[in-house]
Each structure stands twice: as structure tokens, then as C-alpha cells.
Amino acid sequence: MKKTTLAMSALALSLGLALSPLSATAAETSSSAMTAQQMPSLAPMLEKVMPSVVSINVEGSTTVNTPRMPRNFQQFFGDDSPFCQDGSPFQNSPFCQGGGNGGNGGQQQKFMALGSGVIIDAAKGYVVTNNHVVDNASVIKVQLSDGRKFDAKVVGKDPRSDIALIQIQNPKNLTAIKLADSDALRVGDYTVAIGNPFGLGETVTSGIVSALGRSGLNVENYENFIQTDAAINRGNSGGALVNLNGELIGINTAILAPDGGNIGIGFAIPSNMVKNLTSQMVEYGQVKRGELGIMGTELNSELAKAMKVDAQRGAFVSQVMPNSSAAKAGIKAGDVITSLNGKPISSFAALRAQVGTMPVGSKISLGLLREGKAITVNLELQQSSQSQVDSSTIFSGIEGAEMSNKGQDKGVVVSSVKANSPAAQIGLKKGDVIIGANQQPVKNIAELRKILDSKPSVLALNIQRGDSSIYLLMQ
């Protein structure tokens, strides 16, 4: 107890000294000095940047799968059924809204959503955001930091990378952001995230670059994310990740959130990728990707040892498609791609993501390791006959997968499946080969599309999975 009293007395004494006239004069001098040199602050940079970050509100409708009722109950839920009349507890159930008799496999449901965006061209009103922010939108409203509101329309969308470009109608007095060279980023660089989390309005958080080239997250088909610990939450999608110069280094896209909240692991699409994709959208209204025409995997120490490759990182080529850009350049199965245009390639996913932003006709150079020798090949990207398509362009009920022709009329290969997508929910997996649909053989994407053009209420896919043949049913 005495020790406590003494400690408090000492504190009181020091406070008394601090309040003496002599100390007050010293404090005023110190305060003046601090004011003169100014405390470090992000405010001056943010004053220039925040007018280029916008809030986006959308309205639209989407197709949702409705449950299919057992056949012996369907007679009770027709249009004239007492179960579906006004006042019935079943009136608004899916079974009375087209699902009771099997419906058409889906039902239109209206939605409202919000997100963020970044102005990249003030004169033309171009705003970049995430595809998932404006997907299926019929109405898009953009609000600036000064409160002004504008209508906007979609210029182009790319579900594979989750980038979309919208255009503000009748733009006036806008401020565009400057894009940085995201290839120059280093782990440890400071980052600032700006967006509209939870619809609160413009919000700023800060952090650092935690990692670069993140892939394998099953968030998008082309993944080459910047990882940051700057807080990113729902509504931040499409917002800006900037450096301390106020330059755009990425578009905030996703978070790792096991419990739905921020835990300091957020992901942004690099600005160089954004620049390449949006320039194609401006020119073509879509992304026209060039392709190498190879299949491969990540190179790890075990694979390197088994294949007697003197490298630890790179993209291992397991197959080269006939008549592809890679085949014409002389790339062979067993090669390891170590660089693209002179810059190191760490993985197959990184190679795929970088090539995936390049348009048809792009000329590139690849550094290879072949039987222990380093060689360089030059090639021009072309539109491959093995070109992948988004499954939603074939049939809305299997949205969330990428597919390509297997070749030699042997079916359609599922090359990737997004987690929790409709495609994943019906059981499709990466590597599946669709060889039939609704009791009709499927040799290629064109045949699958033709079968599904009739929009069947029930879809039965015959899948070859490894050595097994299975059926997946969607209704």
C-alpha cells in the first residue's frame, strides 16, 4: 500500500511541475516547433485522391434455382390450388412461384447491391470496378465524394478477372486517378484502401503490401492478387488501393474472412492488369485474350527432382495444344517457363494470369529451361481453338466454371470452378469432361450450347471423371 501511495505521489508531483509557469513556456515552445514542422499525415494525399473514388449502387435481377417438389405432391400446387391462393401460408413459397411443377429450373429475383469504383478517365467518365458489383445490373447509380449523383452504363465486363468498366453519363468536373506501375511493388510498401464499406460512405484504411502474386484462391479464374492488411470489408469491392503518392496500385476485390469479418487479409487486382483489361473494353467492349495453348502445373522441389530440372520456381509445361502459339514456337512438354518478357515467372498460375491480360496478337518472349539448358523463344499470341469460355455464356444454371474443347471431338473439359458457384453446387469439378447432356452426346462446346439453347427444365450432364462415368443433375 505504501508503494502505491508513493507512486501516486510521484505522479502528482510530476504533474504539479508540468503545470508550473516554467514548464508551460517550454510546452508552448515545443508545440510551436511541432506545428512548424507538421505531423506526418495522409490527409494531403487523400484530399487529391478521394474525389476519384466513387460509391456505386445497383439494382437488377438474377435467376435463382427453385426447389423441385416430389412428383406425388405436384398436383396440390397448381395455379388453381387452394394452397397457392391469397392468404395461404404457401402463397409466396417457391412451389407456388413456378417451382411446384419443376418450373424452368430458376426464378427471377430482384436485388440491390452496393460497391465502389475508381474514375480512370475524367473526360469520358470511365469508372473501373469489380464485375461482381455490376453483374446483372439493370440500373447503376454512381455517387461522387462531393455528393453528386450520376447514372452509369456498362462498357465492358470480364467475369474471369472480375473487372468491369462502366461509364458515367454526361460527366462533368470529374477527377481521375493516376495508375502506378504495379510491377514495381515490393512486399512492405505502404498501402491505403479507399471505398464504401457497408454503405457507410468513403472510408480510408491503411496497411502494407503483405504479399504479391497471390493465386490459387478460387476467387477468380485469373488470379495474380496483391495481398494487403489494409482493412477491406463488404462494399469495398471495386475501390482503390493506392500508394503513398496517391497512385492506384490495385482494385480491392476480395477478403479472406472465415467468420465474415475482416482479419487483415485482403486482395486487390494489380493496376497493370486493370489497365490492360480496361483498354480492351474501351476498344472492343470485351476482353479478347490471346492464349499460349499449353496446360501445366506449378513447379515444386519434388517435381523438379523427378523431372531432373535445375529450378525451384516456374511454370511446368505438361501438354502443348496442336497448332497453338506455343506449338508453333517450339515449346515442348517438359519445358519449364521461367520468365515472360524478361521478368521472372514464379508459378503456372502467375503465367496464366499475366498472359490472360494480353490481347490477341501480342508479341512476347519466354525464357525456358529444357534439359538443363536456358533458351528463349519468341511468339505471337493467337486465339486458340482450345479457347476457354465462361459457362454462363452456355447456360445460366451452370455459371461459375470455365470450359474448353478437349480436342478431337472428345467432349468439353471443365478447367476451373469457382467456389460456391452454381456450377460447384451441382457438383462440377476441375478436370471433369462433359461427354453428354440430356441423353445426347457432346463432342464440343458448340454441341453443348446447342443442346442447352432450348433451356431445359432439367439438365442431366454425363461426366467422365478419371476412370469413372457419372451423372450430375440440375433441376
UniProtKB/Swiss-Prot annotation:
<dbReference type="Pfam" id="PF00595">
    <property type="entry name" value="PDZ"/>
</dbReference>
<keyword id="KW-0732">Signal</keyword>
<keyword id="KW-1003">Cell membrane</keyword>
<keyword id="KW-0720">Serine protease</keyword>
<dbReference type="GO" id="GO:0006515">
    <property type="term" value="P:protein quality control for misfolded or incompletely synthesized proteins"/>
</dbReference>
<feature type="signal peptide">
    <location>
        <begin position="1"/>
        <end position="26"/>
    </location>
</feature>
<keyword id="KW-0997">Cell inner membrane</keyword>
<dbReference type="GO" id="GO:0042802">
    <property type="term" value="F:identical protein binding"/>
</dbReference>
<dbReference type="GO" id="GO:0006508">
    <property type="term" value="P:proteolysis"/>
</dbReference>
<feature type="binding site">
    <location>
        <begin position="292"/>
        <end position="296"/>
    </location>
    <ligand>
        <name>substrate</name>
    </ligand>
</feature>
<feature type="binding site">
    <location>
        <begin position="253"/>
        <end position="257"/>
    </location>
    <ligand>
        <name>substrate</name>
    </ligand>
</feature>
<keyword id="KW-0346">Stress response</keyword>
<feature type="binding site">
    <location>
        <position position="59"/>
    </location>
    <ligand>
        <name>substrate</name>
    </ligand>
</feature>
<feature type="domain" description="PDZ 1">
    <location>
        <begin position="281"/>
        <end position="372"/>
    </location>
</feature>
<dbReference type="InterPro" id="IPR009003">
    <property type="entry name" value="Peptidase_S1_PA"/>
</dbReference>
<dbReference type="GO" id="GO:0006457">
    <property type="term" value="P:protein folding"/>
</dbReference>
<keyword id="KW-0645">Protease</keyword>
<keyword id="KW-1015">Disulfide bond</keyword>
<comment type="similarity">
    <text>Belongs to the peptidase S1C family.</text>
</comment>
<dbReference type="InterPro" id="IPR036034">
    <property type="entry name" value="PDZ_sf"/>
</dbReference>
<dbReference type="GO" id="GO:0005886">
    <property type="term" value="C:plasma membrane"/>
</dbReference>
<feature type="binding site">
    <location>
        <begin position="235"/>
        <end position="237"/>
    </location>
    <ligand>
        <name>substrate</name>
    </ligand>
</feature>
<comment type="subunit">
    <text>DegP can reversibly switch between different oligomeric forms that represent inactive (6-mer) and active (12- and 24-mer) protease states. Substrate binding triggers the conversion of the resting DegP trimer and hexamer into catalytically active 12- and 24-mers. The conversion of 6-mer (DegP6) into 12-mer (DegP12) or 24-mer (DegP24) is crucial in regulating protease activity.</text>
</comment>
<dbReference type="GO" id="GO:0009266">
    <property type="term" value="P:response to temperature stimulus"/>
</dbReference>
<dbReference type="InterPro" id="IPR001478">
    <property type="entry name" value="PDZ"/>
</dbReference>
<feature type="binding site">
    <location>
        <position position="132"/>
    </location>
    <ligand>
        <name>substrate</name>
    </ligand>
</feature>
<keyword id="KW-0677">Repeat</keyword>
<dbReference type="GO" id="GO:0004252">
    <property type="term" value="F:serine-type endopeptidase activity"/>
</dbReference>
<feature type="active site" description="Charge relay system">
    <location>
        <position position="162"/>
    </location>
</feature>
<keyword id="KW-0472">Membrane</keyword>
<protein>
    <recommendedName>
        <fullName>Periplasmic serine endoprotease DegP</fullName>
        <ecNumber>3.4.21.107</ecNumber>
    </recommendedName>
</protein>
<dbReference type="Pfam" id="PF13365">
    <property type="entry name" value="Trypsin_2"/>
</dbReference>
<dbReference type="GO" id="GO:0042597">
    <property type="term" value="C:periplasmic space"/>
</dbReference>
<feature type="domain" description="PDZ 2">
    <location>
        <begin position="378"/>
        <end position="467"/>
    </location>
</feature>
<dbReference type="GO" id="GO:0006979">
    <property type="term" value="P:response to oxidative stress"/>
</dbReference>
<feature type="active site" description="Charge relay system">
    <location>
        <position position="132"/>
    </location>
</feature>
<dbReference type="InterPro" id="IPR011782">
    <property type="entry name" value="Pept_S1C_Do"/>
</dbReference>
<dbReference type="InterPro" id="IPR001940">
    <property type="entry name" value="Peptidase_S1C"/>
</dbReference>
<comment type="function">
    <text>DegP acts as a chaperone at low temperatures but switches to a peptidase (heat shock protein) at higher temperatures. It degrades transiently denatured and unfolded proteins which accumulate in the periplasm following heat shock or other stress conditions. DegP is efficient with Val-Xaa and Ile-Xaa peptide bonds, suggesting a preference for beta-branched side chain amino acids. Only unfolded proteins devoid of disulfide bonds appear capable of being cleaved, thereby preventing non-specific proteolysis of folded proteins.</text>
</comment>
<feature type="active site" description="Charge relay system">
    <location>
        <position position="237"/>
    </location>
</feature>
<feature type="binding site">
    <location>
        <position position="162"/>
    </location>
    <ligand>
        <name>substrate</name>
    </ligand>
</feature>
<feature type="disulfide bond">
    <location>
        <begin position="84"/>
        <end position="96"/>
    </location>
</feature>
